[in-house]
Each structure stands twice: as C-alpha cells, then as structure tokens.
Swiss-Prot record:
GO molecular function: DNA binding; endonuclease activity
Localization, UniProt: Cytoplasm
One GO cellular component term: cytoplasm
Provenance organism: Shewanella sp. (strain MR-7)
Protein task: Sequence-specific endonuclease that cleaves unmethylated GATC sequences. It is involved in DNA mismatch repair.
The organism's place on the tree of life at top rank: Bacteria
Keyword RNA-binding: no
UniProt cross-references to InterPro entries, sorted A to Z: DNA_mismatch_repair_MutH, DNA_rep_MutH/RE_typeII_Sau3AI, DNA_rep_MutH/T2_RE_sf, Restrct_endonuc-II-like
Family per similarity comment: Belongs to the MutH family.
Protein name: DNA mismatch repair protein MutH
Keywords, alphabetical: Cytoplasm, DNA damage, DNA repair, Endonuclease, Hydrolase, Nuclease
Primary site of residence: cytoplasm
Amino acid sequence: MKPIIPPQNLSELLERANMMAGISLAQIAAHRGITVPKDLKRDKGWVGQLIEMELGATAGSKPEQDFLHLGVELKTIPIDSKGKPLETTYVCVAPLTNIEGLTWQDSLVCHKLQRVLWVPVEGERHIPVGERRVGTPILWEPDQQELALLQQDWEEIMELIALGKVEKLTARHGEVLQLRPKAANSKALTQSIAEDGGLKMTNPRGFYLKTAFTAMLLNKVFG
C-alpha cells in the first residue's frame, strides 16, 4: 500500500476531508487494505489513525501539528445521533517538570489548537465500527473569547502543577480544558514537581477539551 502524499495546501486538505463525508469507516479501511476491528476496546485510537492516514497526516505521535506545513491539527470527534460529542478530546501530554518560564503562547496546547480540522464520526456503540460514517469536516480557529478561556484554564492548571499539587487536579478543574491521567496503564509513572520543590513520581497527565466546549464548537456550525 502506497503512503498517501500529504496535501499541498489547505484547500486540498479540505477537499480530501469533504470527500470522506458520508462514507463508512469500512469503505475507507477497505480502500487502504486495513482490517476493521470488532470493537475499539483495544484499538481506541484506530478511527483517528485511519482518518489521519486517509488525509495524509505527517506528525504521527510527534509533539507537533498533524499538518505542520499547513498549521493544522486534525481531531476526529465521536458524536451521537444528535451531533453531540461522546467524549472529551485529547490535546497533548502535559509537562510536569521543567516548566519554569513556560507561557501559554509557547505551550503545546496553544500551538496545537491554533487551527483544528474537526472530523466528526458516528460513535454510538450500537453501530458496528465499520458501519460508522464520517461527518462533514469543520475547520476551526479559536476566537478571542475561546482563546481566553483556554489560556485561563491552562494557566491555572500549570500553576497548580508548579506548586506540586498535580494530584489535587481533577477532571472537574477548568471551564473548557481539563487535566487527566494519560497512560492506559495506571502503573506507568513519570517525574513531576513535588510540593517541597523537589521531584516525585506520578502518572503521566494529558490535556483534554471538555465535551461542553466541543459541543459548543459543533453547534456554532451545525446549529
């Protein structure tokens, strides 16, 4: 199977994304010679990886935008029959050490969310994975109000991390952005700042967009 050539420009990326609208995941997978999993319990990232491949994304797991040359991050978003997001959206790993002097403008969250191509996909569990269809894509750039909300949450979360209070941060913190354990394996550990300024071991954390925020974004477009 030949790799997909990355899109040369934004209009080519949007054209590819729009061509997928209404098509089932099984059709896309068959076109690429990929087996559709029975369910997503062990293949949680399968849908996103399939869409990335079909669109010619370049980043893989690197900490940069999926289409770095276009300044675009790709996010698949599972939705229900009413078009509402079914789960939070992973943004990136949260830094837990060496964060002195890190500003919102220089953060990976800010970088990743400058411009996002949202690709909605049917996600209700009663629909077999292969039969789930891709929705109409949305190219989103945060407005000033959205950026302010994201920055405020990020700064509050990072301040608590800097004070060694990462364990006190729950998914309830933040209006639009939350911090959650990232590793599938709860035994996975990484270094973080301790309350005495030293280092301690904790579970890796990731930044996620809350569903109320992504629902608002989808609603602005689809109503």
